[in-house]
Amino acid sequence: MWYVDNDGDGFGNPNGTMLSCTQPNGYIQDNNDCDDGRSQSYPNAPELCDGLINTCGGSLPADEVDFDGDFYVECSIDVNGWLGAPAIQGGDDCDNNNAAINPGVTEVWYDGIDSDCSGGSDYDQDGDGQDSDNHNGIDCDDTDASIYLGATDAWYDGVDSNCDGANDFDQDGDGE
């Protein structure tokens, strides 16, 4: 008995049989395919973040369920995209129990919550690696990545780029 393998995954459809002494083209001896229309779905298949059950007889993994209803899931969406229902906007949801926290929201800075799931410090708005001096950091202007303690400071530009508090127009330090 031979079983048709429409999706070419090496697992045959138990409902597509053929009796033959030799193996017909497109048929195999295995009859364990649970979805012969998808080559990513077969017994013990690796689970993909695609919104579909890939492992035959299993259930949708928890990281592919949108528990908070924000249209984001925890896993990183597979390269083939999201195929399940409901439609999902993206993956990498860092808090799947709070709809206000996901990669699609605008970050609210300085509240101590990584609202956009970027993984960075909530106290480093300009992304220069230095937290704001208003939040125990050393960055005196957290809206400009070129301004932080230790940055090179160009004289006479009116900007305290290195956060030392010195007069930008007094290079020789004589007070004038």
Task: Identify the role of each PLM range.
Residues M1-E176:
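Membrane-associated feature with strongest affinity for ZDHHC
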